[in-house]
Amino acid sequence: GGGHFLHSRFNDVMDWVFEHSPRSEWNKFQAKVLIDLEGSPVEFPIELNLWQLPTDQQVEYLYSYLTASKKDIEYKNFEDWIRNYLGDKIADNYMIPYNKKLWCIDPSTLNTDWLIKIPNTNAKLVLKTIIEKNSNFTEEVVSHRSFYYPKEGGFQTMFNSIYEHIKDRVVLGYKTKKLEYDSQNKIWIIDDKYRTKNIINTAPWPVLDVHLNGFNFKKEFEKLKYLSDVISLWEREPYDHKAQWKYIPNPDIEQHREFYIHNYAPYSKPGGVMTDINSIRWRQHNKKWKAGVPLYEHENVYSYPMPTTDYKEAIKNILFYCRDYNLFGLGRWGQWQYFNTDQCIKQVLDFFNSDDIKKFDFFKTF
């Protein structure tokens, strides 16, 4: 799950995708991502684009970043990391308000395990961008420096292409509810209907009723928190910029992120915008807000696993116990990790290429 575009630092993932959905059916773009920083548009990643700010703000943000980046500490939580790695200016005006909008919880209650998604920068690189007035970074810094998007049909076409290769082995439109282990015959029974020796679960664990030797799944599931959000489509006047999406930390604007569809899907109608808002904020606004002429709205209950400070023990207990009975969890929900599409595919490729799946390292990204 996850990911609106195709990009990856894993060559084997890109090769696998293009084996199922030919590269010729994709357009490649250089990413242009904006941050609404104190009313000024600054490109992402922020620390490599401070040179785009007015001079007086450049000095303040750069000083804050450089003095923070010298601190050699062990980060206790996500807010600790933000303040001590990026500095208080970026923390207070971008990262903390943005993440409060995204997660609707205090960033100090989030851990740092998911920071593989954060740009890999350093003070030397930041200073270089200020002097040269050019962010000039590579995929090693940010994996989505460039990305692919289907020439037609939207991102779903990738999954449709994969499905065409395996459709004789896929049941669509079926909602699994119960997994029960028959210890005498050492098989799994799915919804009292299907029987199998092995199961790979990619669904959110809490939607399943799992019965296995009296293991208390409910207790562990209660520690697995998740974010729900609302995706909306709007029509606006055609935009006069080339950005594909923007992060919006301003708490007075409902959405935390918006996508400019025509800038990566040129076959779509000019002025089309997709917005993302946490369901909690959506309800706080009585489900009534406006970011253009409304076209469509959908609430996605399971959007992101929340990297809280106590979830890791729970998902480890689940995965390590279940694997001895050939029940494995993979992907964003199976491993309860903040994975994008490419990372989900990478986990599957590594899982099936491992010498012993019972010893597969579910947490090698930590």
Residue ranges, per PLM feature:
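Dinucleotide-binding Rossmann-like beta1-alpha1 core, especially the glycine-rich loop
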Residues: 1-71, 120
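Short glycine-/acidic-enriched loop or helix-start segments at secondary-structure transitions
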Residues: 16-17, 210-212, 339-340
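Short, P/G- and charge-enriched loop/turn segments at secondary-structure junctions
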Residues: 21, 146, 218-222
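General small-molecule cofactor/ligand-binding pocket signal
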Residues: 27, 169-173, 296-297, 328
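A general beta-strand register signal
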Residues: 36, 171, 189-191
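Active-site/ligand-binding neighborhood in enzyme catalytic cores
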Residues: 40, 58-182, 194, 202
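Conserved flavin/dinucleotide-binding core of flavoenzymes
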Residues: 45-46, 257-366
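Mid-domain catalytic core of redox enzymes
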Residues: 175-290, 296, 314-321
